[in-house]
Regions:
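Conserved sequence signature across two-component system core domains
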Residues: 13-14, 39, 57
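Active-site residues of response regulator receiver
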Residues: 14, 60, 88
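The feature encodes the CheY-like receiver
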Residues: 19, 64
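Short hydrophobic/Thr-rich beta-strand motif most characteristic of the beta2 strand and flanking loop
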Residues: 32-40, 48
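Acidic catalytic/metal-coordinating carboxylates
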Residues: 41-44, 65-70
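Short amphipathic alpha-helix used as the core "switch/output" element in two-component signaling
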Residues: 47, 69-81
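The short loop immediately C-terminal to the conserved phospho-acceptor aspartate in CheY-like receiver
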Residues: 55-57, 61-62
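Short, flexible helix-to-coil linker/hinge segments that flank and couple to helix-turn-helix
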Residues: 94-101, 105-136
């Protein structure tokens, strides 16, 4: 189990630059969270995860070149120590099931309050699961 004594190093992958910028802004205002890399597609996410070894990868589900589900499977096969938090607009049960079966540690809706997303990042970093309360 990891502790929160040092910054949580986050990779942020979403194909929408405006979404990445907004998430980056509130994550970096939070104590002990640092966005170390950003990707605008799934293949770039895999490359940057391998290169930077983040503590947590935040992935959108629908991205070009590889989906968040595909990237999650890749992480579990190649970078097991990286926590995966899927941050998406999809609240359908089949997506939630597919993401969790792929090995994600958390699933949070983009409509969640920034504090909830920050809490989910911290939960995933410390080895806990993080599920959006609106999905339950």
């Amino acid at each position: 189990m990891k502790t929160q004594t040092s910054s949580i190093r986050v990779l942020l992958a979403d194909d929408h630059a405006v979404v990445r910028a907004g998430i980056r802004q509130f994550l970096e205002q939070a104590e002990n969270i640092q966005v170390i890399a950003e990707a605008d597609d799934g293949e770039m996410a895999k490359t940057l995860i391998a290169e930077h070894q983040p503590d947590v990868a935040i992935l959108d589900i629908q991205m070009p070149k590889a989906t968040g589900i595909e990237v999650t499977r890749w992480v579990r096969a190649n970078q097991r120590e990286v926590g995966v938090l899927v941050l998406t607009a999809y609240d359908d049960a089949p997506y939630v099931t597919a993401v969790l079966q792929a090995g994600a540690n958390g699933y949070v809706l983009k409509t969640a309050a920034p504090r909830e997303i920050i809490r989910a990042v911290r939960d995933v970093h410390t080895g806990n699961s993080a599920l959006d309360a609106n999905l339950l």
